[in-house]
Amino acid sequence: MHVRFRHLFLLPLITLVACSQPVSKNHLSLTSLSANAQQPVVNNAWLEISQGALDFNTKKMLTLLDNKSTLCAILKGDAYGHDLTLVTPVMLKNNVQCIGVASNQELKTVRDLGFTGQLIRVRSATLKEMQQAMAYDVEELIGDKTVAEQLNNIAKLNGKVLRIHLALNSAGMSRNGLEVSKARGLNDAKTIAGLKNLTIVGIMSHYPVEDASEIKADLARFQQQAKDVIAVTGLKREKIKLHVANTFATLAVPDSWLDMVRVGGVFYGDTIASTEYKRVMTFKSNIASLNNYPKGGTVGYDRTYTLKRDSLLANIPVGYADGYRRVFSNAGHVIIQGQRLPVLGKTSMNTVIVDVTDLKKVSLGDEVVLFGKQGNAEIQAEEIEDLSGALFTEMSILWGATNKRILVD
C-alpha cells in the first residue's frame, strides 16, 4: 500500500483499528513462538555417540596397559569428529592422565571441561598459537631449532619455563622431527636442550605405516637416536618420557609402549589391529517422504539410474551438505528396518533416494542408518572407505563437522 503525505493524518486511526482486530488462529502467538524457541532443534540427520562403547574402549585400553605405560588419549580433530565436549568427560571419569590435541580451541575446551592433567599438542604450532597457549599449560611438540629459540624468547618475556617434547624423524615421516642421524640434527638437539626457558620432558617420533615389522625396525632406530640425544644433551633419562606408539603399534607391537603411548582411533573403535573395540559413532536420519514411481522412470540429477520395476522410493533428507558425499551415488547402502537398501541416483546437496520397494511395511519417519548398526545389519567403515577413497577418520571428522552429535546410552 502506498501512503501519500496527505493521508498521514489517518495513520493513528488505521493503527488503532488494526490493533483492535482479533488475532487469527492461523498466526502463532508470541507465547507459542517463545516456547518453540526453547525447544531443541529437530535435525534432519545426526550422529549418535555411544557413551557406553567409548567407556568400554577406554577401560579396555587401560587394562591392556596395566600401568606399564602412560596412556595419552589423542582427541585431536574434535575427537575424530565425535565431539570433544562429549568424549573428554569419559576420559575424566576413567582418570586418563594425559590428553593430546592439536588446536588452541581444543586446548581451551579440554581445560574448560575440568581436565588438569598432562596436555600435549601433537603437531607443530605457529608462534602465535604457542604464545596464546601458554595460558592452557600445554606441552608443545618441537622439532625445529629456530622455532625453539623463538619460543624460548617468548617464554622468557612472559617469565615462564615451558615444557616441550622433542620430535625426532627416526620413523621417516619427514614432517616435524629433527634428523638426528646427521650431525646437524644432533647439534640442533643440543642447542634446544640448552635453552633456559624450555624444558625437554619427552622425546618422541611417529610411525607412518601400520606394519609390525617396519615398526619394530623404526623402534630400534628411535631408541638408539633417543640414546644419542640424551648423551649429547646431558638430559637425565629418568626425567624424559620416550613415546612413539600410536594405536596400531600399541596393539600390535607391545615393545613400542616405552614410557607412554599415544592412541586415538581405538577409543572410537577405529583400528585394523583389533576387532575387540566397539564402534562409537552411528550416522542416522529419517524417511521424509515416500512415492511410487513407474518402471522406466529415472532418478536424480543427470538421470543416472533408470528404474527396472515399479518402485517405492524413500526420500532421505541428507546429502553432501551433511557429509554424505556424491561418491555414494548409485553405490552406497543404508539400513531401514534392519535391511540394507540401495541408494539410487546421484546424491543431492540435501537428499538421497533409497529403494524401499522390498520392505513389507515402511512409514514416514522410519529410522535410517547411513553408518553403523541397526538390528543384524551394518554399514562398516571398510565399506565407507572403499566407496569414498578416504580414510574413515576423514569421513567421521567431516560428518562431525556437519551434523549434530548426540550422546546416547
Curated annotation (Swiss-Prot):
Keyword Isomerase: yes
Residues carrying N6-(pyridoxal phosphate)lysine: 76
Cofactors named for this entry: pyridoxal 5'-phosphate
Residues annotated to bind substrate: 175, 349
InterPro entries membership: Ala_racemase, Ala_racemase/Decarboxylase_C, Ala_racemase_C, Ala_racemase_N, Ala_racemase_pyridoxalP-BS, PLP-binding_barrel, Racemase_Bsr/Lyr
Pfam families reported for this sequence: Ala_racemase_C, Ala_racemase_N
Gene Ontology CC: one annotated term: cytosol
Signal peptide (residue range): 1-20
Biological-process GO terms, alphabetical: D-alanine biosynthetic process
Disulfide bonds: 72-98
Active site: 76 (proton acceptor), 301 (proton acceptor)
SMART domains linked: Ala_racemase_C
Compartment(s): Periplasm
Keyword terms: Disulfide bond, Isomerase, Periplasm, Pyridoxal phosphate, Signal
The enzyme's E.C. designation: 5.1.1.10
Reactions accelerated catalytically: an L-alpha-amino acid = a D-alpha-amino acid; L-lysine = D-lysine; L-arginine = D-arginine
Gene3D superfamilies given in the database record: Alanine racemase, Lyase, Ornithine Decarboxylase, Chain A, domain 1
Main localization of the protein described in the UniProt heading: periplasm
Translocase keyword on record: no
A GO molecular-function descriptor: pyridoxal phosphate binding
Function: Amino-acid racemase able to utilize a broad range of substrates.
Family: Belongs to the alanine racemase family. Bsr subfamily.
Name the UniProt record assigns to this protein: Broad specificity amino-acid racemase
Organism of provenance: Yersinia pestis
